[in-house]
Swiss-Prot record:
InterPro entries: G_CP_dom, NA-bd_OB-fold, P-loop_NTPase, Ribosome_biogen_GTPase_RsgA, RsgA_GTPase_dom. This is Small ribosomal subunit biogenesis GTPase RsgA. The gene is rsgA. It comes from Haemophilus influenzae (strain PittEE). Keywords: Cytoplasm, GTP-binding, Hydrolase, Metal-binding, Nucleotide-binding, Ribosome biogenesis, RNA-binding, rRNA-binding, Zinc. Its EC number is 3.6.1.-.
Amino acid sequence: MAKRKLTQNQTRRIQSNNAKTLHRHKKKDIEWSDEMLGESQEGVVVTRYSIHADVENEQGEIYRCNLRRTLSSLVVGDKVVWRKGNEQLQGVSGVIEAIHPRENEISRPDYYDGLKPIAANIDRIIIVSAVLPTLSLNIIDRYLVVCEIAGITPLIVLNKVDLLAQEQRQEIEDQLKIYQDIGYEILMISAKSGENMEKLTALLAQGTAIFVGQSGVGKSSLINHILPSVNAQVGDVSETSGLGQHTTTSSRLYHLPQGGNLIDSPGIREFGLWHLDAEQITKGYREFQYVLGTCKFRDCKHLSDPGCALREAVEQGKISPVRYDNYHRLIESLSETKSQRHFSLV
């Protein structure tokens, strides 16, 4: 009798269980006894791999470390307590023993495990978009919701503006004005021509920043311009799908010559928000806050409800109709994505 064909979800679950089994097996390979380790010291996680992490000590030296099994999830930017080994074991030089409380973190939805943290202790999120494959205000709004909820300052960067004719550039600037009007900072740059790159590096010097955005928007090109010695692999936009080809495999923290730190993380084709509810997404729109709670009905859905203060603010020109429409698209997508819990990672 022919075997019944597995569904896509069953195949994914089998692959996930297999990967977790291999992960547990590998963790047993290296066991550190207390006498093999030196004194505790402070460090920062600069790269996170599946079962190891690279930690930078206070002298700027980087060591590959194992993780204590009692630790919760570890991400780039985490401040940790670790101990250096007296010798290397299978290329590992020490053990991370504790994680300091995080000032903040950003996470993305994970198909199997709910939320998966990406990075921690961030001062600014650089939302990189581009004129190719297309400028998506909906994607920008998704990232801004995350910034508002996490309490992290965003910077909207439009890359590859050298590809625009003057008329096209004016049209893009008009589209982005809705963000400037509510206090978001916009920077139009070109890694190729160098336009406004000095302004970007000056902003990056003000703390720890992370680049986010779809693949193909030029994040790796920007890093190559800011840090030529890194030589991050650059990916092209697929002619077939219009989506960027993945170039970064692990999140990594870089120190910038002019000061500050930059975290580069793997590209995400679709930044899912299914882990949020409608109330959280509403709080992610900063210009909505002054009218929330003033609607006629407490359970107002902010659509055709009578006495909706939010809709009235849109009609009066106080709130952008584009942002208002994007907001409802995000709300409508919640039930769909929560039932499927499916998004595409590069």
